[in-house]
Amino acid sequence: MNLRPLTSLLALFSLLGLKARAADLRVGLIGLDTSHVIAFTKTLNDPKAKDHVPGARVVAVFKGGSPDIPSSANRVEGFTRDLLKYPEIKLYDTVAELVKNVDAVMIESVDGRPHLKYAQEVLPSGKPTFIDKPVGGSLRDSIAIYALAKKHNTPVFSSSSLRQAVQAALKDVKYGELRGATTFGPCDIEPTHPDLYWYGIHACEMLYTVMGTGCVTVQRTHTKNVDVVTGVWADGRVGTVRGNRATKGAYGLTVFGSTNVVSPEIKTGYAPLLRDVVKFFQTRVPPVSAEETLELMAFMEAADESKRRGGAPVKVADVVAANQPR
């Protein structure tokens, strides 16, 4: 039996595979103190991964880390070691050096406070940048980041993976005209951040995925284990987020429509988000607008202001005006 044709064919497939990998966009990760960097890298870099997303791969990392947040300080070294087991990944001492050696950037720091500083180093490059939640450690920082992106004509987007989960859950669901929605999810609080920025942002992003922009007022009820945040939209629709503490970390959604009320199953996972990220890197077209992301951040900031005022309604526009970059 002549094996030469088979051997040649296998060699060709191997060569094509190498060329395809060589054409992948080179991605740099900034801030290695979150489990997202491990999950994202496996999904992008490992063709054998269950939910592998092709088209980009992590080749550069910058450690970062925040000593005053235990979940950052206690994990950043271990996550860094795990990432450096990939032979294609190089650790850089500065963000500037990382940016020079990649095509696109993912700001991943679990701590939103350094995101503005990182953005100031990355966005002048013009390279497409995904910023993991939250965009910034405050509404003021978040507004400044998007202003910087506009100044340098650099495409930016931010999203929780729960956005894509909601989109998938509602793909073929009919409910007529949207009247409102309720979401729920975990809402652990980190003292260095506005209350909902840390974990409640997932359920808030779920709400905005359904409702879109246009929230006028926000009102919050707060107890030790629960936050209930209600937004009233300009057209009269009402959206509610319930953030749970000391309960099972589940996510849920109910959509109220003119013809139906639906509560679809929410299936979580990172692959749908990463498919959006890779497409964004390739096209430079953000799948989520700056307007929507900034209103989401303002919604959560308004919830904190409502808490400070004893649960009084707060106008989103007033919160935005009070948090313009200095």
Report the location of each language-model feature:
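Hydrophobic residues in well-ordered beta-strands that form the structural core
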Residues: 93, 131, 156-158
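N-terminal glycine-/serine-/threonine-rich beta1-alpha1-beta2 phosphate-ribose binding loop
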Residues: 22-125, 150-151, 213, 309, ...
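Short helix/strand-capping hinge loops at secondary-structure junctions
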Residues: 126-128, 133-134
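Rossmann-like dinucleotide-binding domain that binds NAD(P)(H)
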Residues: 181-248, 291-298
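C-terminal helix-rich "cap/oligomerization" subdomain common to oxidoreductases
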Residues: 105-106, 282-326
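C-terminal segment of classical bacterial N-terminal signal peptides
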Residues: 15-21
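Bacterial N-terminal signal peptides that target proteins for export
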Residues: 1-8, 19
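A contiguous active-site-proximal alpha/beta segment in oxidoreductase catalytic domains
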Residues: 135-193
